[in-house]
Amino acid sequence: MLFRSRTIPMLPERLSNKLCSLRQDEEKLCFSVIFELNEKADILASRIVRTAIRSNRRFTYEEAQDIIETGKGDFREEVLALNELAKLLRNKRFEDGAIDFDRYEVKFEINEKGKPLSVYFKESKESNHLIEEFMLLANRNVAEAIGKTIKGKSKKTFVYRIHEQPDPDKMQNFAEFIGRFGYKLKTTGSKGEITKSINALLDKAKGKPEQNLIETLAVRSMQKAKYSTHNIGHYGLSFPFYTHFTSPIRRYPDIDRKSVV
């Protein structure tokens, strides 16, 4: 549970922050999703394996962002290469019909007594997108590895993270509301046409006084993502297969996926 001034972990602190956490210069046993990508971020090969990992460096998002912006720092070549691949993966997602709900995060400045001093908006930067894209890639790959039926073998029962198509009535109401601000939204047609229209709307609203309102209502016009053993794909991400796998310390369903893998 995440509060303004503290975090209550799902697992005991000895597990979540020490034994199960990838701490610098400590060897940890892991499930790893390993990819071979070319310079265009095409997946040439992938595998899910048990590994032992020793982390050479633990970065904060701010430290990684500084390397991306300045080109200087520890493991600069690795960080910059990963960032270039992440940008390609991100562009491909949107080309395939993913929706760009990249909203500002509300943050609080807290004093030592837990009293909020100020509130501010935190914008996602390239370092955030870098982690996000490889997290999505791993989650998608695990879902595909389990969910795709292999000839001659029975389909395995698996829990997917699914996201249905938006309700037409909600979309129409949303389109009528934003029309008051002079915006237009396509609510009928192919999935690609609708998601392209949504992304164009969100892009046009950026920097405008009504940006936060439109982004909030756009999210509310969507269906809620949920877990299901019946896979229908993930509409918002535009993935035919998707699950939660990468955060077993803070999300119980991810522990369940690892037991299946």
Feature locations, PLM:
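Electropositive polyanion-binding surfaces
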Residues: M1-V261
